[in-house]
Amino acid sequence: MILCICEKPSVARDIGAVIGATTQRQGYLEGNGYWVTWTYGHFCTLKEPADYYPQWQQWSLVYLPMMPERFGIKLLSDRGIEQQFGVIKSLVSQATEVINCGDAGQEGELIQRWVLQMAECRVPVKRLWLLESLNNRLVGHRGEPQPLHRHTALRHL
């Protein structure tokens, strides 16, 4: 199955209607060889200093600068986000391909890439570049989904 991940439920419904994924499931739509799921804004954030080292919980000049070897991300602590992320992670683990249908631009790209990283995505990812989705008719669609490497520059914020 091909998994489409949208940035919001309304876009998922619009895309689902276009590609024939109209059967409602818990946290996603299904049909015609596709799963269409969604986030709702930011699901992930950068880790806090204490997430790296417990001694960084309290700010002290002794520990400055606080520079981890590698910056990490974590899922936001929210029951709804955790539940929907569980759906996404399960679908990612079963998908043969993922299509990033996040909002156009750097922020939309970052939201989707962090979710895919947290979900440990190991299948090919493509990017569907949408400027707007309206009334089950995709507007501003620039062709077929493209390999993700064509949009690599967007991840450099």
Model-derived segments and spans:
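Intrinsically disordered, low-complexity regulatory segments
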Residues: 1-157
